[in-house]
Structure formats: C-alpha cells, structure tokens
Regions:
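Short, surface-exposed, charged amphipathic helix/loop patches that serve as local interaction elements
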Residues: 17-91
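Short, isolated positions in well-ordered beta-strands
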Residues: 10-13
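Short acidic-hydrophobic surface loop/beta-edge motif
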Residues: 1-8
C-alpha cells in the first residue's frame, strides 16, 4: 500500500500490517496516560509500519525542520496520518 504522510513522506507499507497484533498493542499503548509508555508505543509503531523506511522517514522529517531535528510532534502527526489510512483499509 502506498502512503503519503501529513509531512509529505511517501513510502510503501505492507497491507498485512493491519493483521499484526503488535501494531494493535502499540496503538492501544499510545493512548495511555504514561508519557514513557506512549513514546515506546510510537517507536514500536514506526518500526512496525515503516520497517526499512524508518531512517528515510527520519531524514525526511529532519529536512522539513529549520533546526534539522525530528520532533515528537512531527512523528506523532505522521503516524496518525498513516494509522488513519490503515484503519480505512481495515473497514
């Protein structure tokens, strides 16, 4: 499945990721109140969803930021845009 994130990052992701229990758990963990749990869940989601595209994703986000940093907010926004597309695929 081809996706384009909110920031404009384009990549292919495995459509079968919707069947991976680890992603379901990570999405649920991302809703918890504990910030450390949420961060760990975001890391897991990036790795599960993007796989080999993870470093290219970070480089893309870095290039979009004037300070050349990868912000937590940018990661969160892009993950949300991908997850929304995945949810639409499941429905």
């Amino acid at each position: 499945m081809k996706v384009t994130t909110k920031s404009g990052f384009k990549c292919d992701i495995n459509e079968n990721i919707t069947k991976d229990w680890r992603l379901t758990v990570a999405i649920a963990e991302a809703q918890k109140d504990d910030p450390q749990v949420r961060i760990t869940a975001a890391i897991d989601m990036v790795r599960l969803i993007l796989g080999d595209n993870e470093q290219a994703f970070y480089k893309h986000l870095e290039s979009k930021n004037p300070d050349h940093i990868v912000s937590e907010q940018d990661i969160t926004d892009d993950l949300k845009s991908i997850i929304d597309k995945i949810k639409n695929l499941k429905n």
